[in-house]
Amino acid sequence: MAKSFFAAFLIIMLISSLVDGKSTVGQKLKKKLNQAVDKVKEVLNKSEYMCPVVSSFCKQHCARLGKSGQCDLLECICS
């Protein structure tokens, strides 16, 4: 999945570089791409979504809330 995401990103970057930056189509494409990148960064910065990958993220997230945390499948449970 990471390879296909990277390939799609490269294709989008290629298309955006070919489109003239002054045209409205190029500006709209760049704006949408920036919004998508910002949304991905926002999701990745939330520790509870990283719980299945690394359980320490759940513990850190719950510690910020003043609770103890445990990762249960796809859910971070703070108690």
Swiss-Prot record:
Tissue-specificity statement: Expressed by the venom gland.
Key words, A-Z: Antibiotic, Antimicrobial, Disulfide bond, Ion channel impairing toxin, Neurotoxin, Potassium channel impairing toxin, Secreted, Signal, Toxin, Voltage-gated potassium channel impairing toxin
Disulphide bridges, residue numbers: 51-71, 58-76, 62-78
Lineage top rank: taxon: Eukaryota
Origin organism lineage: Eukaryota, Metazoa, Ecdysozoa, Arthropoda, Chelicerata
Entry keyword annotation includes Transmembrane: no
Role this protein plays: The full peptide presents antibacterial and cytotoxic activities. The synthetic C-terminus (AA 33-76) inhibits voltage-gated potassium channels Kv1.1/KCNA1, Kv1.2/KCNA2, and Kv1.3/KCNA3.
Localization terms from the record: Secreted
Signal peptide: 1-21
GO cellular component, as recorded: extracellular region
Protein name per Swiss-Prot or TrEMBL: Potassium channel toxin Hge-beta-KTx
Stretches assigned to the BetaSPN-type CS-alpha/beta domain: 48-79
